[in-house]
Amino acid sequence: PGEGGGFGGGAYSVGGGVTAPIPIYKPEPPYSEEARKAKYQGTVVLLIIVDTQGNVSDLRVVKPLGLGLDEKAVETVRTWKFKPGLRNAVPVPTRVMIEVTFRLF
């Protein structure tokens, strides 16, 4: 059943022979209108599970940012594609922490 309130049961953590998934499709999330008007910037931290196909199978916000940016990060990261994490050269579901940074230029 895994750790942390049942999140990611069966998923491996990186280390101890488990390699990290590698992003191969990683579009930037759009800004929320509310955050753009407030000139709000920062980073949303997400805990994600990458399945054996390289898809994001589950995720949760670990460090929210607010002003609609958490939702934008979640929507976008769900579309990301990865080269799956490996254990003994075999793809395994892998739990990783990622940061999504919002910056106005």
Give residue ranges: language-model regions.
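Hydrophobic beta-strand positions in extracellular immunoglobulin-like domains
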Residues: 48-50, 102
